[in-house]
Amino acid sequence: MVVGNSKGVPVLRSLTRARTPGVVRAPVLTTLAAVLAIAAAVLAPRAFVAAQSHESAAKLFGQFFGFTASQLAAVDAGTSVAVVLPSSVDHEIAVAGAVFVQATAARLVSVLQDVERLESGKGFLRTKRLSNPPRLGDFAGFQWPAGDVEALRDCRPGRCSVKLGQPAFDLLAKIDWSAPDAAEHANAFGRQSSLDYVLAYRKGGNRNLAIYVDSERPQSVAREFEEMSGGVDLWPVVLTPLAKYLRGYPTAARPRQTSDFFYWSLAEFGLRPVFRINHVVVHGTGRASGPLHVVLVKQLYASHYFRTALEVRAVVGDGRPSGKGVYLVMLNMARSDGLTGVLGSLIIKPKATRGSRDGLERALAAVKRMAEARR
């Protein structure tokens, strides 16, 4: 059920409204819709916007992100700021943030698409953009972390520390673990099954996403994603076609000025590295101000922790002349294991939430540095 707030802005059913400064006052996906709608409507007349850009930015981030006056000043000064988005779903974490970037919109969106550079350095072990169409060689650099190889050796449906669907378990059962090259066979299994998974998704979309059976309770990636992103129907005209395309891929019509690609990454999360496969959609609005570019990153698979995830990255202009700077807005949503129960809700989730917020601030700052360094 979707309800409205006092100003008529729809509220996503899985999120609650915050009452304290510094915490977001609107839900995740609807928040971005409101942000971009305000940017498009309020900032449209360039002469008017040029005179009141700071005021518009204050409304943008203050009213809908709940930024305090000091946070607003920090964003305008080029400091990244991130806040926690309240959620009524116990196994969901959502954070949002923004930073002003002194670069053109074109340069910033090019950085956002350069995933191999964007996801590199500390914490990132390997990132690879896939060919179009994807091929087995794209996964040549993939190797299971040593801990995962040991875990896979003993994995069974319903009892495995690596997230796998039934087809993967069927292939895993064919490995001769007594062979001296068993680890390489496990890596070959990972490469081939990853390629098959991406190709199946490209053919059948969400219906071909995994149903994880590594624990006693099967987890449907497609169902979790549909539930988490259920508010995307409320996005404004600019984003609605993108939301439909992401949910209905590959049969849904792809909006104009839209491209997509896939990539995999191996990065450190918590106690162990996580192998992930993502679908990226990039859209240029063709507008002179407001939402200029939107990048959506949909997680298709994660070897640990994450059931599903969605990242939204928006390049928002406030009417300044080209090259004088734009805002980068980022929203990260994820549904994860281990966040429920007494231990999960009281200890693990608060720590993970703080880590997600702090991580987003670092990511915003890193993207800003990359974009400004390329001027």
Where are these regions (language model features)?
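Short alpha-helical segments used as structural interaction elements across diverse proteins
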Residues: 22, 43, 295-296
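N-terminal secretory signal peptides that target proteins for export/translocation
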Residues: 1-25
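Short, well-ordered alpha-helical segments enriched in acidic and aromatic residues
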Residues: 110-111
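Ser/Thr/Pro/Gly-rich low-complexity linker/stalk segments immediately outside membranes or between
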Residues: 47-51
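Terminal "cap-and-tail" regions of soluble proteins that handle hydrophobic small molecules
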Residues: 52-101, 105-107, 117-375
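Bacterial N-terminal signal peptides
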Residues: 27-46
